[in-house]
């Protein structure tokens, strides 16, 4: 079966950000077609939740593709339309099991031109561990 898939090219106009592609539930064929459509519009391809099998297929197609295995993300091209902001975002993960999601968030922010800093495994069960990062995260004004 070949279901229609559509990329939201108007998202940048509405939100200032290009759409990320959720790779987990898409076939290799769908990811290939979506990537080709996005590249044809001179936009960056950002695929999240992609496994190594799908990523390796796209890496073979696109020499300038980069796979970030720990984040389960693949990027093809460069974002030439980054946000112009001096804001900084802190990304805080409670445990090491959150690493992939933390790295995905960091990649997304970096692609869009947002300065960020990740704090990995700060602990949520022990308040003393989280509080020890307060002096680093408060100046950011944005915490994920």
Each model region followed by its residue ranges:
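Arg/Lys-rich RNA-binding interfaces used to dock onto structured RNA substrates
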Residues: 11-14, 58-90, 94
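Short, ordered loop/turn segments at secondary-structure junctions
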Residues: 25, 50-52, 72, 95-96, ...
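Glycine-rich phosphate/diphosphate-binding loop of Rossmann-like nucleotide-binding domains
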Residues: 90-126
């Amino acid at each position: 079966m070949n279901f229609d898939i559509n990329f939201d090219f108007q998202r940048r106009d509405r939100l200032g950000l290009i759409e990320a592609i959720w790779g987990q539930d898409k076939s290799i064929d769908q990811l290939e077609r979506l990537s080709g459509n996005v590249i044809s519009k001179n936009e960056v391809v950002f695929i999240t939740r992609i496994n190594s099998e799908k990523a390796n297929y796209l890496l073979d197609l696109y020499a300038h593709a980069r796979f970030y295995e720990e984040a389960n993300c693949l990027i093809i091209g460069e974002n030439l339309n980054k946000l112009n902001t001096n804001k900084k975002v802190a990304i805080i993960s409670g445990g090491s099991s959150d690493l992939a999601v933390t790295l995905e968030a960091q990649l997304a922010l970096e692609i869009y031109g947002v300065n960020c800093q990740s704090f990995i495994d700060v602990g949520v069960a022990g308040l003393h561990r989280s509080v020890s990062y307060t002096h680093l995260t408060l100046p950011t004004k944005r915490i994920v």
